[in-house]
């Protein structure tokens, strides 16, 4: 187990009654609030009106930034920064999933900073000195952004999708009501399940192998996600299933499962250029890339993948080598993603052309910790295998 420092200051209100705590949280901040959200779904479900009523009852002046898309763009961040500076925003309230939250985080650290937020934080990785307070009302369990200090932003002009970490990007509070997920389309739920599983696997399938508590927690989280996903797909309003999906996605990135691990984010690093270049849904891209990546490193990571097969998928090890167990575990993962959930299985199905592979490899961060350090040629081969 490696040395670590653990810190997570997010106050979480979880449950069917979680929204009742919004007024008390709003009372802790100043009068000017920037409300951020995506498309029209929160208006169709009535959530927008509930939030607006709470803001008005709290005496807040509300300014809005709507239309935040999946793979949130730099353009929306710039727009939000301008609104924050113009109206002297005291609190950003993000209502939605990871895209809305990440865009809001980038705005939170970008608005008080001098210079261009992209160059300052996402290219030069300068440390943020302060940030506008952020609150979250989660509607899509997927990214875990409601409990972490990271924000992923896409620059379509350069074809880059980069991540920035800062303690000023931790939300001050997060409201997690599983009933808010009942109306999600199946494809959004599936993408969220895949993203959560990918986070858990990247934390777990990484050295060292002697971090027993963290690894056991990760295995339990993966088994929970799989079981809850199967129930939720059959019955979208199964509260216990939705509650477990929501809490597992948050738990995956709250920092607990990083403790003592080096972590291997290579699948995310390969997928990010696909989203940046072709606007691929993040979870859909991971459903294709992550199993192919595990197949590629299977021999190097055989002991860990064999444990993954036994303890997560229930593979019987009798008479099988670690390599054979590992392959059966990956096969079980692919069946879950592609057959049970119906997630895409190939890059071709996502509309990604084979001609882009060299460019994707060029944009892929190869600095991740792994059982097998990749080169650009390795990335190209992985992409070919899942085409």
Can you describe what each PLM-predicted range is?
Residues 1-91, 347:
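ATP/NTP phosphate-donor binding region
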Residues 10, 20, 112-216, 307:
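A glycine/threonine-rich phosphate-anchoring loop and its flanking beta-alpha core
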Residues 19-22, 44-47, 74-77, 99-105, ...:
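Short glycine/serine/threonine-rich phosphate/pyrophosphate-binding segments
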Residues 312-387:
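C-terminal charged capping/lid subdomain of soluble metabolic enzymes
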Residues 51, 81, 100-114, 147-148:
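Short Gly/Thr/Asp-enriched flexible loops that form oxyanion-binding sites at enzyme active sites
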Residues 89-105, 139-145, 277-280:
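Glycine/serine-rich anion-binding loops at beta->alpha junctions
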Residues 203, 207-332:
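Active-site segments that bind and position negatively charged phosphate/pyrophosphate groups
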């Amino acid at each position: 187990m490696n040395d670590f420092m653990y810190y997570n200051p997010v106050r979480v209100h979880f449950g069917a009654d979680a929204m009742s705590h919004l007024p008390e949280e709003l009372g802790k901040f100043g009068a000017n609030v920037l409300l951020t959200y995506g498309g029209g779904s929160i208006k169709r479900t009535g959530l927008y009106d509930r939030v607006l009523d709470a803001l008005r009852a709290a005496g807040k002046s509300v300014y809005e930034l709507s239309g935040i898309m999946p793979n949130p763009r730099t353009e929306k961040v710039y727009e939000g920064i301008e609104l924050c500076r113009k109206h002297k925003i005291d609190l950003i309230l993000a209502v939605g999933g990871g895209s809305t939250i990440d865009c809001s985080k980038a705005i939170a650290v970008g608005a008080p900073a001098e210079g261009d937020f992209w160059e300052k934080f996402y290219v030069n990785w300068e440390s943020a000195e302060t940030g506008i307070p952020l609150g979250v009302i989660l509607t899509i369990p997927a990214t875990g952004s409601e409990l972490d200090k990271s924000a992923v932003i896409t620059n379509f002009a350069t074809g880059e999708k980069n991540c920035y970490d800062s303690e000023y990007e931790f939300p001050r509070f997060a409201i997690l009501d599983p009933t808010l997920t009942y109306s999600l389309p199946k494809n959004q739920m599936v993408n969220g399940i895949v993203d959560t599983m990918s986070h858990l696997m990247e934390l777990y399938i990484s050295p060292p192998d002697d971090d027993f508590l963290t690894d056991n927690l990760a295995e339990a989280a993966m088994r929970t996600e799989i079981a809850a996903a199967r129930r939720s797909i059959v019955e979208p309003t199964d509260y216990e299933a939705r509650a477990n999906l929501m809490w597992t996605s948050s738990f995956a990135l709250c920092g607990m499962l990083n403790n003592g691990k080096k972590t291997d984010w290579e699948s995310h690093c390969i997928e990010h250029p696909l989203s940046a270049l072709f606007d691929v849904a993040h979870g859909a891209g991971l459903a294709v890339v992550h199993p192919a990546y595990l197949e590629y490193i299977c021999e190097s990571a055989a002991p860990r993948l064999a444990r993954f097969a036994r303890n997560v998928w229930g593979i019987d090890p009798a008479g099988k080598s670690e390599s054979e167990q590992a392959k059966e575990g990956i096969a079980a993962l692919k069946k879950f993603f592609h057959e049970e959930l119906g997630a895409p299985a190939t890059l071709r199905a996502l509309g990604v052309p084979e001609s882009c592979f060299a460019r994707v490899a060029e944009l892929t961060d190869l600095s991740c910790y792994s059982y097998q350090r990749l080169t650009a040629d390795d990335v190209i081969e992985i992409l070919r295998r899942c085409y």
